[in-house]
Design a protein with these regions (language model features):
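Conserved AdoMet
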Residues: 1-92
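Active-site micro-motifs of SAM-dependent methyltransferase domains
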Residues: 17, 36, 73, 111, ...
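A structural alpha-helix within SAM-dependent methyltransferase catalytic domains
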Residues: 68, 106-110, 222
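Active-site catalytic pocket residues across diverse enzymes, especially alpha/beta-hydrolases
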Residues: 71, 75, 109-113, 140
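Conserved class I S-adenosyl-L-methionine
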Residues: 84-104, 118-124
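Extended basic-aromatic, gly/pro-enriched interface segments that bind polyanionic ligands
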Residues: 94, 114-201, 205-213
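A short glycine-rich, Lys/Arg-flanked "PGG" loop and its adjoining helix->strand segment in the class I
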Residues: 215-223
Length: 223
């Protein structure tokens, strides 16, 4: 993750919150604790703090229009896509944050595939931040988070629920959650999968890396 001088206040604010929660005296004490921690807790906490989690449903909508108008028809007519009589489709949301992107993928696929039962669809959602991965698995979003979605789609793909504070919220329907597998993953470690993906969404994580790192990741995605 590339952290320039323009991110200093962001980093200071996020670590300041952790220091207060741990009732530490300041950054020096926190740094000393990081150096002596052998459990891995410090590293996970640091990664969760500095990974930015800006996301929303149907963010960068052009990508989902491309899925509907180009990707789905291309996969459908590919003979190699059929396995066991079904059309195989695999997608990956790399840097999935709290899951809005991958659930938007699911909704887009269901809205634009006429006979979904004839498809074998599996979506992978990964992120370095363990907290947002857990959020995505739960699939619960505040009314504010879903406010940009068409009411007809909310009714079709969400159930009324409550958030962790007991406030009215929405939860993705079970059939959407079953399409997605959430996993904690560091993009710079070994990837625990070998099968090819038909599409990868990675913009939301790539923008936080410098150019050489971006080029290295693009080559890995391609391979």
């Amino acid at each position: 993750i590339s952290l320039g001088k323009n991110k200093m206040e962001l980093v200071r604010a996020r670590f300041g919150k952790i220091i207060r929660q741990r009732r530490m005296s300041g950054f020096r004490e926190y740094f000393q604790w990081m150096q002596t921690d052998t459990t891995g807790e410090a590293l996970r906490e640091v990664m969760d703090a500095i990974s930015t989690n800006l996301t929303s449903f149907f963010r960068e909508n052009d990508h989902f229009v491309f899925m509907a108008k180009t990707l789905i028809p291309e996969v459908e007519k590919r003979p190699s896509s059929r396995a066991g009589g079904k059309i195989r489709l695999r997608g990956w949301s790399a840097g999935c944050s709290t899951g809005e992107e991958v659930y938007t993928m699911s909704i887009t696929l269901r809205e634009n595939i006429s006979r979904i039962e004839e498809w074998d669809i599996k979506l992978l959602a990964t992120d370095l931040n363990t907290e947002v991965v857990a959020h995505g698995q739960r699939g619960i979003y505040t009314q504010e988070r879903v406010s940009g979605i068409q009411p007809s789609l909310i009714k079709k793909y969400f159930d009324p629920a409550q958030d962790e504070k007991g406030k009215p919220a929405y939860r993705t329907k079970e059939f959407l959650r079953k399409m997605v597998t959430f996993r904690h993953l560091n993009l710079f470690s070994e990837w625990p999968f070998r099968n090819k993906f038909d599409f990868i969404f990675c913009r939301n994580v790539m923008i936080y890396f410098d150019r050489p790192t971006q080029e290295g990741l693009i080559n890995r995605y391609y391979d």
